[in-house]
């Protein structure tokens, strides 16, 4: 079974896609999938599009059609943890929705009814990422909580609200939680690796445009090393 790699934007999948050998392109319901060998390892790459619904639909099609052994979600994110800089990579320990509120009925903030409050990344995939970290001196990598919502966070008020609800948050983005939720439903292990493109503040949009390429390159490098290490361990 292939390893699945999901990125929302062209910039987030382009480097990985260009590294594929024996490439085969498939379009299902306007979602683009790219099969091939990445460093001799079978993979399938999905360009999901931006946002939670796009990510959920694309991931469902991916898992149902291609039957991957595991899922790696890559791309960019806004940095929340103190000390995080543009280009640093956050590896998920768990993923949550930051824009779901059904607390009136006894659920945790961010919890979708009938679903877990948090989606825990696969221990083997986290351990693999840790092994990769030791070999990547040029890229700073940290672990932590990644939260997801259907908004690009670019103001202090919303940043502070997220920090209030999730004090341990490391990064914020727009696709990881639905990807993790679909993986949970299909019982497929996942991990999220996101490179910091901005600080989720008033300068976020300018920073994102300027540093998206750096963030995408660093996240892609991390994914390629994780894929190689997973293959070597089997």
Curated annotation (Swiss-Prot):
GO (cellular component) term, any one: cytosol
Signal peptide: none
Residue ranges the record marks as coiled coil: none
EC number: 3.2.2.9
Entry binding sites for substrate: 78, 153, 174-175
Example of a GO biological process term: L-methionine salvage from methylthioadenosine
Active-site residues, record numbering mapped to chain: 12, 198
GO MF terms held by the record: adenosylhomocysteine nucleosidase activity; methylthioadenosine nucleosidase activity
Superkingdom in the source lineage: Bacteria
Keyword Amino-acid biosynthesis: yes
Catalytic activity: S-adenosyl-L-homocysteine + H2O = S-(5-deoxy-D-ribos-5-yl)-L-homocysteine + adenine; S-methyl-5'-thioadenosine + H2O = 5-(methylsulfanyl)-D-ribose + adenine; 5'-deoxyadenosine + H2O = 5-deoxy-D-ribose + adenine
Pathway(s) per entry: Amino-acid biosynthesis; L-methionine biosynthesis via salvage pathway; S-methyl-5-thio-alpha-D-ribose 1-phosphate from S-methyl-5'-thioadenosine (hydrolase route): step 1/2
Keywords, in A-Z order: Amino-acid biosynthesis, Hydrolase, Methionine biosynthesis
Pfam hit, one: PNP_UDP_1
Similarity field: Belongs to the PNP/UDP phosphorylase family. MtnN subfamily.
Its biological purpose: Catalyzes the irreversible cleavage of the glycosidic bond in both 5'-methylthioadenosine (MTA) and S-adenosylhomocysteine (SAH/AdoHcy) to adenine and the corresponding thioribose, 5'-methylthioribose and S-ribosylhomocysteine, respectively. Also cleaves 5'-deoxyadenosine, a toxic by-product of radical S-adenosylmethionine (SAM) enzymes, into 5-deoxyribose and adenine.
Name used for this protein in its record: 5'-methylthioadenosine/S-adenosylhomocysteine nucleosidase
Source organism of this protein record: Exiguobacterium sibiricum (strain DSM 17290 / CCUG 55495 / CIP 109462 / JCM 13490 / 255-15)
Higher taxonomy: Bacteria, Bacillati, Bacillota, Bacilli, Bacillales
The gene coding this protein: mtnN
